[in-house]
Amino acid sequence: TIHAGKSVPNIWSIGSFTFQEKQAFACEPFVTTGEGLGFVHEGKVKNIFALASRKKTKDKEADEMLDYIWSNFNLLPFALRWLLEKWEEKEARRILEILIKKKAVHAYPVLVEGNGQRVAQAEHTFIPNENGVTITTNP
């Protein structure tokens, strides 16, 4: 996954912790149907990516995409659809595969509910401070 570190369960459990000031946290609830198993796992589809290396690949098209990714997204994750301003989808996928194989781009899988049911997800990032909390993902 993109995020790592502390996990906040829905209920208190052994190992629960207190939020510390000036640390950033991502609150990322998942909602499933009532028929779900109650957990998610990585699926096969990958539509979120992040730059892993700026090292040139010696492939002109791949290097052009690397430059575009760096200029537009830097080290932040990006969606395939954001590349479609410059490339057709089939071409973007082909070039991304080259970058993934050369370990220049990392692909993140879509999360799937344990028994294949639908999953909805939202996210806010927040930073506790002495006055409460700052939510950095507010519009």
Report the location of each language-model feature.
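Active-site neighborhoods and metal-handling regions in enzymes and metal-associated proteins
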Residues: 1-139
